[in-house]
Amino acid sequence: QRQMCIRDRPYFIDSTNFYDGYWQTSKYFKPFREELLEIFSPSDIILKKVFDWRKSIDSSNTVAVHIRRGDYLNNINRNSLKGGNVIGDVDYYLSAIKIIKEKVKNPLFCFFSDDITWCKDTFSNKLDNSLFVENTGSDAALVDLFSISFCEHGIMSPSTFSWWGNWLRKDKNGSIVVAPKGEYSNEYFLEKSWLII
């Protein structure tokens, strides 16, 4: 793959080749979605941790809000996001939340982030129907990834982690996913059903 988030022409594949690239478009593997969902199923340990936080809530309208900050906070990574930057852009997230509220009855906004303290400080006084999920331990990223996929709806940050969490959602019927406009919002990276704002 020559350019990130853009699908190249298909090449002949044989077992002696090694392929290197970002592969950040489902156009490469959409025909194998069911197979991939089976391959990328969480282990029993991860699944238990996902359900541990979910069983404490009484909502079938969970919305995963993924906010990536971490490495995007330094100027080099922040400036590499061409055509838009939503890192820490509270307005983007509030707009996405407003859209979800208009379309989903009684949504519960479940925040996942590598900076959950910032999320609490920023959003806890703006929403009364929110949950800040703090997974810890060496498997926290996997628990977050599958937790995002088990939520009924999603609000993405511009990251492949966010993309995979939403793409791995098994039941997509009626699922609403909001994604930010920018470098990643091209016809290859985002699914056609996702809302771009």
Task: Walk through the language-model features, giving the residues of each.
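Non-catalytic N-terminal targeting/anchoring module and adjacent flexible stem/linker
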Residues: 1, 8, 178-179, 197
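Short, conserved active-site loop motifs that form the nucleotide-linked donor/cofactor pocket
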Residues: 2, 129-131, 194
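Secretory-pathway luminal glycosyltransferase catalytic domains
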Residues: 3, 7-104
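Short aromatic-enriched loop/helix-cap "lid" or pocket-rim segments at secondary-structure transitions
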Residues: 76-79, 123, 189-191
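Donor-binding and catalytic core of enzymes assembling or modifying cell-surface/extracellular glycoconjugates
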Residues: 98-187
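Leloir-type glycosyltransferase catalytic cores
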Residues: 183-197
